Amino acid sequence: RQLELHRGLNNYTQNSVRDAVKDIVGIQFRNLATVGGSIWGRFGFSDVLTVFLAMDTYVELYQGGRIPLREFVGQKPDQDILVRLVIKKTSGCFSYASVRNQSTDFPVIACAASVVGGEYRLSVGARPGRAMLLLDEEGLLSEGLTEDSIENFAMWAEKHIPTGSNHRAGAKYRSRLVRVLSQRLLNKLREEQKWR
């Protein structure tokens, strides 16, 4: 709940963090849930992990020290202790969206897009596997966000984000949602950049 109401964090992320947690079950549950539990568990359905993965974020481990969240997500669970989550205040634009079968259900797919320090990032969770980060390795957005570059990146993301099926949705549907949501989020980033 603190994430949802934190004015500084939401100003920094253009309300992306608020958007990521507002549909999590209910206020009572959000009051009890912890950021550390969501990050440490690396749950596939985690809205929190998805949104923080798109940022310049690090985890500090008791024994392992400070490592980028993108590395931590790929590691196997161990007995180390998560001490803190560190969000670098690198200048950027952020956006988040998810699709749910019901408003308080786990997401069918969750996406966060960002441009941080000139690097475009797309984080996709509820694939139904762990959230993963896709960077613009092909340079499709290197000339900036235009209608064509956004559409090309969205099609590329659809092909490069592996999805699976479960009782919430099929893999093909999820892949299509990756394309649609990444387009929407990048268009939102483009609008945000116009105002800066």
Regions found by a protein language model. Give the residues of each.
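C-terminal structural segment of proteins
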Residues: 1-196
